[in-house]
């Protein structure tokens, strides 16, 4: 008999939001009797952009911007019906992208 597993992947630009959301998910799952593995921090994806400061000349003068995408991964082993219902009702911040695989 194969056990069920819910894999949750969180993605956000702000690490404080993603850590707070991961903590809420872990507490909710443990309160309903499920076993949680994680949250596992995945490598942060850094996108860098170089933009010319001047609209006409001075190509050597540039501004550099970056966007950091933080990722967390967690597995919920043997979830009960109460666990799934509690996770569906959970209200997470708007800046966190949640991806769930069964």
From Swiss-Prot:
GO terms for cellular component: ribonucleoprotein complex; ribosome. InterPro entries: Ribosomal_uS10, Ribosomal_uS10_CS, Ribosomal_uS10_dom, Ribosomal_uS10_dom_sf. GO terms for biological process: translation. Pfam families: Ribosomal_S10. The keyword Ribonucleoprotein applies. Keywords: Ribonucleoprotein, Ribosomal protein. GO terms for molecular function: structural constituent of ribosome; tRNA binding. Transmembrane segments: none annotated. It comes from the Bacteria. NCBIfam families: PRK00596.1, rpsJ_bact. Part of the 30S ribosomal subunit. Belongs to the universal ribosomal protein uS10 family. Involved in the binding of tRNA to the ribosomes. This is Small ribosomal subunit protein uS10. The gene is rpsJ.
